């Protein structure tokens, strides 16, 4: 099989080239500019409701203090209350695996940026042990990341001191540092002694001693550099100026109850009433305090006693600030940068991350809420920190990522408990402040479990699909089909891993699940397709291998009149098997294939490039991944089908060789005189074994995997079409019967197609319906927004321009109200606009600021920036009102669009931003996006139809594209109505499944239509079939039904599983959407099949009606004779045995009867005697002269024709041809056809009863309509006498009529010479006198019948004047005899049953100018529908009597009589006009009731 004819392989190669082209384009786009997300018209959006907002380095837990009455919280009272809460968090502990952990162990510490490159795994082993110990202890003492308004005061120092244990356990810290120092020095060296109660002071002293120890030089850094980093760390944690939140207290006083034990023991040791009264005044106790404190135990009730002391302190503050509590004490805090101890070397400025405005927000009034943020390490960072600690301490690390997650979850749960307890404490109730966590605590391990559940679900769904297909589609070839399925999957996986990874990773997300779904469906469909061809259809073809040059015409004539509801299923099964065999036989055995590529297929392939490019650029930038997922299955299936067909052709050649050898062997045996042995059964056999062995009426091949054929005595195909089980067989039979009934229903196609089209149009309308989208629950809100920049190829020349654009961007985004700046690095970039080296110097000098303000920027070396240069600006929403956020989102989108080119596509990320962006912006353009995508895909599918189909037409192609993309629009409408996420995945799967469902039935129907309409271009064509006969495309439709029934079954089972198992609940909605997608795809596929079937059937009927005028055996004989007259060298001979014509003993010909009919039949039997009769010679001469005169044929050719028929002189063999063969009139193009006496002409069919059969898709064979013998023909002599008498009678009547009235030429009469009929065609009077030798002297009329013409249309002697001569229908029939001629443009103005010849006859110009002057025998044909409108348009305009002729002499002389006539008409017109003007008004003209 030639590669050019294997369309599937050519198409797969074309799409492979396009896919890799898109892949290269996406790679170049990603590396040269930005990630590929910017190329899509509508970005993907998701709802991360259950996910914490994370950055690259840490997790954030947000806590809110909210005043119940909306008072301003910028006062010492509420800041002091907030300080109590921070102390409670600092003392929080968690026990995990029998070990106690504090917040200091899990919090994120930005000061580690100072030593970012030092504790790296590749560098840590190169440091001395005492340096490693020093770095570990410095990391433990580093402050945690806490964003709080207390960063503006000295109070934050005490909080971090409590968390990091700066003043506690200094002896233990001192001992570990001293031991590491002593291990590094020799015994003779001095051993210093350091003592301090402040942890950082111990670090400072021991660092001075450790760096004085002589050691080997370090490779990656110097000791001086490391020591400078230690100094930087010490200066960065130094306390700021002592500005207290409570101006009435000293900053040295602690905010907690560190001396509570002394107070408690004093209160409980006093028993005397007077002493208690004195202590009450001393401690300022109120009523009830004494009783409360005396009941507490100083050891067991420590927390309750501290809580009471905090409440007492707040009571005192309320008394002091009672008159001015409504006036805030610290109104300037929102305008300050409160970084606390997070400052760098430059202590005069802080970090924008700790801007005061970020610590306050409003709920019911301005500044009624205090915001707190705690930074925790990510599980990965926590794992690295714990392993580093175990390594330095010399322990074997037992930490894993799962344990790190568990420890973080324990702290988050403990934080929730601590917040709840503090919100219910005495101090919170006193100041009416509610404390809560903004983000709900996730379930333990939910993210990780979700990933595992997704993997389990994907594997389970794949296994279920494969099992169902193996049981119900792969038949007995299970192992082969399964191996090919796994091979396709393995190759696809390898290509996807190597070509579709992003940054070395492949995310198992919704897109990955979409790719899995599409590949699984396509791989299963292609495996089933190849299985059908190889092991089911291929087996049926074997039965026709004996007929090496067979055109399989017998397969196209299976009547299905008995296929009713009560029909035999065995018979239906036989019909299905036979037509399956027929379909594959045409593809596998045709030396001249039916399915050819279009003439300019390479141009069509080029057109695919811009279409796919537009889809990739504007719709989905990951379309190359979809192509890579599908192409391996496509390519392997194409090669596998080519291999199977080549194998079948090779077996066919082997069969021919075996037959040739057997023929030669038989010839050799006959030549050796071994006929006796052959007849006696003792013939010499060849050495080969018998090729066939009989078994149960079916012949099987002896070798493995060889040929086998059906026995001709049975039609039991159970051994050939081996179905997996009876269920599949019944399903296919039911589907086949359902298709029969649907196609037989008259208006079924119109109803189904209309309903499907209305459903698609309704879906388009639903896309534009405004739907009220649900908002995010308030407790799940995250009011942060980050804008990520990734600027490629930053150089010294572009650095200044980038800073200018960033400055403009900052100024515009600062103008947006309700959006506060967290950090955008503006100060950093402005201070370093001169050179890039200034920025790199700032990165090295201020590591904390760099670490917090630009976490995405990591220069590999200090001399240049990474490519692309990544950094992040962070903002926060002041208000979480829906209208406010929508306004901010729209303005941010405008800014991002404005700076797309200059700042390389900045991208906004944030929970609230993405959520409200989806609600306010994305859904508004969702409808336009889907319609644009549908239009692009419709063009793509139209090109595919043109690429694959033979002779495509416009309407079926548009219908196919419309219904396939309609599946996407319907799913998009569902997504829009229910606001579903992952819309791109749903719509991609929808359009892909719709194409799979509709393509195979439509493609096979289009190919079958091409075989019927273009049968002249091929040598082997299926026979014409009436409307009651089975069509081949039903097989493809039944295969599609079988495949999608399996898909629907698997999807329903998955829905049940996801509804029952709680872990799979997240996949319930996607599975339901998949089920709806499959149902819509099947319905749209049915609509496509019915609509295309009706269009093709009408086209084929029209074609055969004009071409053959009959669909009986006669029509086939005419077609065969035409091929005989115009043979081609490459044509194969068409044996007569293929047609329903039986041979007879005698042969009769069309010819006129002899003149003398008085001789007895016995004398005519002797041929020689008759030939010598002079009367016969005279008759022969008269016949030749008449034929020459009427047809214009040369006399030599007529004599040669008469001489070739020796039975010409037998009078009984002359039959009149006034009737047509098969009951249909024949013209000259049919040639001389021989009539056989064994077959009589069938009766003319009834128009009303057999109209469907006459104009069906093809003409079938109807053996019952022909007689079995020649007796039904009748007596030829009697028939001739009747014709002669009838002609004589009509001749006499015509003579009488001519004498009465003058003759009017009747050009429609074929006997009247005219423009289209130069000579009479039927009757001519030869002689009115009787022959002299005849005994009967009465005049006799001799009638000659015009024989059929043998060659082209006779020449017309003169042309017809269309203005005076009426047209002839015969001329238009001859003019429109070409079936490939396009239809008339005026055909829509006439009934559908009108042929092109009839339309041309009605549109002749003669009827326009002779409407009122027609001859008597020329009737007016039917007028078109727009006749009235045309008459009004084409009528001459009214005469203008006021027209003044132009000056000068006219070029055409005007007769004087014409001028006088015009003047008389003008005067008459003026008189009538004046009379109408002077006419009195009629009373009837008066308006009234």
Curated annotation (Swiss-Prot):
Changing residue 30 to N: In strain: HK104, HK105, PB800 and PB826. One of its GO terms (biological process) is germ-line sex determination. It is found in: Membrane. Residues 1-33 form the signal peptide. InterPro entries: Ce-Tra-2. Residues 1402-1423 are annotated as: MX regulatory domain. Keywords: Developmental protein, Differentiation, Membrane, Receptor, Sexual differentiation, Signal, Spermatogenesis, Transmembrane, Transmembrane helix. One of its GO terms (molecular function) is transmembrane signaling receptor activity. Plays a major role in controlling sexual cell fates. Promotes female development in XX animals where it sequesters one or more of the FEM proteins to the membrane thereby freeing the tra-1 protein (a putative transcription factor) to enter the nucleus and promote female development. In XO animals it acts as a receptor for her-1 which prevents it from binding to FEM proteins thereby repressing the activity of tra-1. Negatively regulates male development when bound to fem-3 and is required together with tra-1 for promoting spermatogenesis. Also required for feminizing tra-3 activity. It comes from the Eukaryota. Residues 1275-1298, 1326-1340, 1423-1433, 1460-1482 have a biased composition (Basic and acidic residues). The chain crosses the membrane at residues 454-474, 489-509, 513-533, 600-620, 622-642, 749-769, 931-951, 958-978, 986-1006, 1041-1061, 1066-1086. Disruption phenotype: Null hermaphrodite mutants have masculinized germ lines, producing only sperm. Animals make incomplete male tails, producing shorter stubby tails that lack sensory structures called rays. Its main location: membrane. Residues 1138-1288 are annotated as: Interaction with fem-3. Residues 1143-1176, 1233-1393, 1412-1489 are annotated as: Disordered. It is a multi-pass membrane protein. Interacts with tra-1 and fem-3. GO terms for cellular component: membrane; plasma membrane. It comes from Caenorhabditis briggsae. The keyword Transmembrane helix applies. Coiled coil: none annotated. This is Sex-determining transformer protein 2. Residues 1444-1456 have a biased composition (Pro residues). The keyword Membrane applies.
């Amino acid at each position: 099989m030639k590669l050019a004819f294997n369309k599937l392989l050519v198409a797969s190669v074309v799409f492979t080239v396009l896919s890799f082209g898109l892949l290269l384009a996406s790679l170049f786009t990603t590396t040269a500019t930005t990630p590929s997300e910017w190329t899509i018209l509508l970005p993907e959006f998701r709802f991360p409701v259950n996910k914490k907002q994370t950055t690259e380095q840490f997790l954030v837990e947000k806590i809110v203090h909210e005043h119940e009455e909306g008072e301003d919280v910028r006062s010492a009272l509420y800041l002091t209350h907030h300080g109590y809460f921070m102390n409670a968090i600092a003392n929080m502990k968690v026990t995990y695996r029998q070990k106690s952990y504090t917040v200091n162990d899990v919090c994120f510490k930005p000061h580690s940026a100072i030593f970012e490159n030092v504790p790296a795994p590749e560098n840590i082993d190169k440091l001395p042990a005492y340096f490693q110990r020093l770095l570990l202890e410095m990391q433990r003492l580093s402050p945690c990341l806490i964003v709080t308004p207390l960063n503006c005061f000295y109070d934050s120092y005490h909080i971090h001191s409590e968390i990091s244990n700066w003043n506690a356990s200094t002896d233990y810290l001192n001992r570990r540092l001293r031991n590491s120092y002593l291990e590094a020095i020799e015994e003779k060296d001095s051993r210093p002694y350091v003592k301090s109660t402040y942890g950082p002071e111990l670090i400072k002293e021991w660092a001075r001693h450790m760096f004085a120890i002589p050691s080997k030089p370090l490779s990656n850094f110097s000791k001086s550099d490391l020591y400078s980093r230690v100094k930087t760390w010490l200066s960065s944690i130094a306390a700021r100026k002592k500005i207290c939140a409570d101006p009435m207290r000293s900053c040295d006083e602690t905010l907690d109850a560190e001396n509570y034990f002394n107070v408690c023991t004093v209160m409980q040791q006093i028993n005397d009433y007077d002493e208690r009264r004195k202590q009450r005044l001393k401690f300022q106790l109120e009523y009830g305090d004494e009783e409360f404190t005396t009941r507490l135990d100083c050891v067991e009730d420590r927390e309750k006693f501290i809580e009471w002391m905090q409440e007492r302190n707040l009571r005192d503050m309320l008394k002091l600030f009672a008159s001015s509590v409504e006036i805030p004490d610290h109104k300037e805090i929102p305008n300050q940068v409160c970084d606390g101890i997070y400052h760098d070397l430059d202590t005069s400025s802080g970090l924008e991350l700790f801007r005061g405005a970020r610590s306050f927000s409003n709920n019911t009034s301005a500044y009624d809420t205090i915001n707190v943020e705690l930074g925790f390490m990510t599980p990965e960072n926590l794992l690295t920190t714990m392993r580093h600690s175990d390594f330095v301490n010399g322990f074997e690390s037992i930490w894993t990522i799962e344990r790190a997650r568990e420890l973080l979850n324990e702290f988050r749960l403990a934080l929730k408990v601590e917040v709840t307890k503090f919100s219910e404490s005495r101090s919170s109730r006193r100041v009416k402040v509610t404390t809560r966590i903004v983000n709900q605590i996730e379930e333990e391990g939910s993210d990780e479990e979700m990933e595992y559940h997704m993997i389990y679900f994907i594997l389970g769904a794949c296994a279920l699909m494969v099992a169902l297909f193996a049981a119900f589609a792969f038949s007995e070839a299970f192992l082969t089909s399964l191996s090919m399925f796994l091979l396709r999957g393995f190759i696809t996986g390898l290509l996807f891993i190597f070509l579709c990874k992003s940054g070395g990773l492949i995310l198992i997300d919704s897109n990955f699940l979409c790719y899995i779904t599409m590949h699984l469906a396509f791989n299963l469909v292609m495996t089933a397709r190849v299985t059908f061809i190889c092991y089911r259809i291929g087996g049926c073809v074997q039965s026709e291998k004996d007929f090496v040059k067979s055109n399989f015409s017998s397969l196209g004539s299976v009547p299905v009149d008995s296929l009713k509801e009560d029909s035999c299923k065995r018979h239906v099964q036989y019909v299905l098997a036979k037509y399956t065999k027929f379909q594959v036989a045409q593809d596998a055995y045709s030396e001249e294939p039916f399915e050819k590529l279009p003439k300019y297929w390479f141009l069509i392939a080029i057109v695919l490039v811009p279409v796919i490019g537009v889809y990739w650029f504007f719709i989905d930038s990951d379309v190359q991944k979809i192509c890579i997922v599908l192409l391996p299955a496509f390519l392997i299936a194409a090669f596998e089908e080519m291999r199977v067909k080549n194998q079948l052709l090779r077996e066919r050649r082997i069969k021919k060789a075996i037959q040739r050898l057997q023929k030669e062997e038989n010839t050799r045996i006959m030549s050796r005189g071994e006929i006796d042995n052959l007849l006696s059964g003792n013939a010499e056999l060849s050495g080969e074994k018998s090729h066939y062995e009989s078994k149960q009426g079916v012949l099987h091949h002896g070798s493995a995997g060889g040929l086998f054929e059906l026995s001709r005595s049975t039609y039991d195909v159970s051994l050939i079409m081996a179905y997996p089980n009876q269920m599949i067989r019944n399903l296919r039979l039911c589907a086949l019967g359902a298709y029969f009934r649907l196609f037989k229903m008259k208006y079924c196609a119109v109803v189904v197609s209309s309903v499907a089209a209305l459903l698609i149009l309704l879906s388009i309308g639903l896309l534009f319906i405004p739907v009220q989208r649900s908002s995010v629950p308030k407790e799940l809100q995250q009011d942060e927004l980050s804008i990520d920049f990734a600027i490629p190829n930053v150089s010294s020349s572009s650095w200044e321009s980038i800073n200018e654009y960033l400055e403009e961007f900052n100024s515009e985004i600062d103008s947006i109200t309700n959006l506060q700046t967290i950090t955008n690095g503006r100060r950093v970039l402005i201070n370093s606009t001169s050179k890039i080296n200034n920025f790199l110097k700032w990165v090295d000098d201020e590591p904390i600021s760099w670490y917090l303000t630009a976490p995405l920027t990591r220069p590999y070396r200090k001399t240049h920036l990474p490519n692309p240069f990544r950094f992040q600006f962070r903002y926060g929403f002041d208000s979480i009102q829906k209208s406010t956020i929508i306004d901010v989102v729209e303005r941010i989108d405008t800014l991002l669009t404005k700076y797309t080119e200059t700042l390389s596509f900045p991208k906004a990320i944030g929970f609230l931003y993405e959520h409200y962006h989806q609600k306010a912006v994305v859904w508004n353009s969702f409808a336009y996006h889907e319609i644009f995508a549908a239009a692009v895909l419709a063009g793509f599918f139209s090109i595919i139809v043109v690429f694959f189909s033979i002779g495509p037409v416009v309407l079926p192609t548009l219908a196919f594209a419309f219904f396939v993309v309609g599946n996407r629009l319907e799913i998009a409408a569902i997504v829009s109505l229910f606001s579903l996420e992952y819309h791109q995945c749903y719509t991609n799967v929808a359009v892909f499944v719709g194409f799979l469902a509709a393509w195979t039935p439509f493609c096979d129907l289009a190919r079958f239509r091409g075989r019927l309409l273009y049968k002249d271009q091929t040598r082997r064509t299926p026979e014409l079939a009436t409307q009651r006969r089975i069509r081949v495309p039903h097989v493809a439709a039944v295969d599609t039904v079988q495949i999608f029934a399996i898909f629907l079954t698997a999807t329903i089972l998955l829905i049940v599983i996801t509804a029952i198992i709680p872990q799979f609940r997240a996949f319930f909605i996607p599975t339901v959407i998949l089920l709806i997608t499959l149902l819509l795809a099947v319905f749209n596929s049915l609509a496509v099949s019915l609509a295309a079937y009706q269009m093709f059937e009408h086209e084929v009927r029209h074609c055969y009606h004009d071409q053959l005028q009959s669909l009986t055996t006669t029509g086939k004989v005419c077609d065969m004779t035409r091929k005989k007259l115009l043979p081609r060298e490459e044509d194969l001979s068409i044996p007569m045995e293929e047609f329903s014509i039986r041979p007879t003993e005698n042969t009769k010909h069309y010819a006129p009867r002899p003149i003398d009919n008085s001789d007895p039949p016995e004398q005519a039997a002797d041929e020689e005697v008759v030939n010598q009769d002079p009367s016969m010679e005279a008759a022969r001469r008269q016949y030749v002269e008449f034929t020459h005169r009427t047809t214009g044929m040369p006399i030599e050719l007529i004599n040669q024709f008469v001489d070739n028929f020796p039975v010409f002189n037998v009078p009984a063999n002359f039959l009149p041809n006034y009737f047509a063969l098969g009951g249909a009139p024949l013209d000259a193009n049919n040639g001389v056809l021989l009539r056989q006496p064994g077959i009589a002409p069938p009766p003319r069919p009834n128009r009303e009863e057999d109209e469907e059969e006459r104009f069906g898709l093809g003409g079938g064979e109807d053996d019952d309509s022909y007689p079995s013998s020649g007796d039904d023909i009748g007596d030829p002599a009697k028939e001739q006498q009747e014709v002669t008498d009838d002609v004589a009678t009509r001749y006499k009547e015509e003579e009488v009529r001519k004498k009465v009235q003058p003759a009017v030429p009747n050009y429609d009469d074929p006997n009247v010479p005219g423009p289209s009929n130069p000579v009479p065609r039927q009757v001519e009077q030869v002689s009115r006198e009787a022959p002299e030798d005849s005994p009967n002297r009465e005049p006799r009329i001799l009638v000659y019948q015009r024989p059929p013409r043998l060659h082209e249309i006779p020449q017309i002697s003169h042309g017809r004047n269309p203005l005076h001569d009426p047209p002839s229908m015969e001329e238009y029939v001859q003019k429109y005899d070409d079936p490939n001629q396009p239809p008339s443009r005026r055909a829509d103005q006439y009934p559908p049953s009108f042929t092109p010849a009839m339309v041309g006859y009605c549109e002749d110009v003669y009827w326009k100018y002779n409407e009122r002057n027609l001859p008597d025998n020329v009737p007016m044909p039917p007028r078109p529908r727009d006749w009235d409108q045309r008459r009004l348009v084409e009528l001459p305009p009214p005469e203008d009597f006021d027209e003044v002729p132009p000056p000068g002499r006219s070029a055409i002389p005007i007769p004087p009589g014409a001028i006088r006539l015009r003047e008389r008409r003008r005067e008459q017109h003026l008189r009538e006009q004046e009379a109408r003007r002077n006419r009195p008004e009629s009373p009837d003209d008066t308006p009234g009731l």
